[in-house]
Amino acid sequence: MTSTDGIYIEGKRIDTGDCSGPRSARNVLLHPDVDAAVFETARGGVLREGLGFDLCDVAVITNIGIGDHLGLNFITTVDELAVVKRVIVENVAPEGSAVLNAADPVVVAMAQHCPGQIIFFARDRMNPVLATHRAQGKRVVHVERDAIVCGEGRKKHRFPLANIPLTRNGAIGFQVENAMAAIATGWALGISWEVIERALAGFVNDAQTAPGRFNVFDYQGATLIADYGHNPDAIQALVDGIANMPARRRSVVISGAGDRRDDDIRQQTEILGDAFDDVILYQDACQRGRADGEVIALLRDGLANARRTRQIDAITGEFLAIDTALARLQPGDLCLILIDQVEEALAHIAARIAEAR
């Protein structure tokens, strides 16, 4: 498997850093022990070198939303970004499938470019795209009461959300969508329901298994969540998910990627300002072309009309910002830490938790 965290083979990491490009994919395919591969396929690598493979059995597009990385590499609109992202859909084998989010119109439009079959997924079973696909007897995945349901014609299979720890009994909406996409992928590959069920039940998104992906910790009776979310869509998904988690007081630690557009940086704190009591801003280790303090100023601008936030602090340094947030926590509080240096920040958090025991 390749990802922005590295290359993993048989559960062991053989390379670190951003390995979501075609060179890493080719390295995996050339490995003598590999029979099947999963590739995170990033925009940048596709633009530079294309794909690291000819055809894929399954292509998965979870969402495009309002877009990310716009303004870079001459990609300025969501539609232009979609043209890049859909390359994996265009290169599905004729007997393969594309797993597409029926709730994202830009993703839905990719279906016409797929040489294989389409499996649509969406939380809302009444989604028009999903309903039409289901009425045609084609494969769909959706949520029905307390379960994820796979449907094809009159056939159905249910996966109780209570048996999928990733979703916290269905409370974390974006994790439900991730689980649906994973289930649809397994279904497309012909993997048995039993194997899919065991995989879902056994997967825990902790700092070791999925670093920086909604990692939850207990800190002296308060809840910490560490996540690498760094665009408005990700921030909104996190806010929606955390809304279902009880908390006495809510705080957030955030920086911004300097290579994003000004509006994209501002919009992140516009969202957070309506959901958190305290906001701690910090400057990324790498400013990505911005002057010192420029990103912090944009983040402050986004909080100008905050409906909930009452305390705003700007801290120099990610770890000092984390320590500042931890020092303020009381039992029953919740703190979202939007990390930049993923491995280092998670190690720092783990050390602080160990010290507090």
Language-model-detected regions and their locations in the chain:
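A structural preference for short, hydrophobic beta-strand core positions in alpha/beta folds
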Residues: 1, 120, 312-316
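Short beta-strand segments
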Residues: 3, 40, 60-62, 101, ...
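ATP-dependent carboxylate-amine ligase
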Residues: 169-172, 184-194, 198-357
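Residue-level signal for inorganic ion chemistry
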Residues: 2, 40, 99, 118, ...
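Adenine nucleotide phosphate-binding catalytic loops in nucleotide-utilizing enzymes
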Residues: 74-82, 86, 96, 115-236
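Short, ordered loop/turn segments at secondary-structure junctions
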Residues: 4-5, 64, 123, 284-286, ...
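Flexible active-site lid/hinge loop adjacent to a nucleotide/diphosphate
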Residues: 9-120, 125-129, 163-167, 232, ...
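Short beta-strand-centered segment that lines the nucleotide-binding/catalytic pocket of NTP-utilizing
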Residues: 1-10
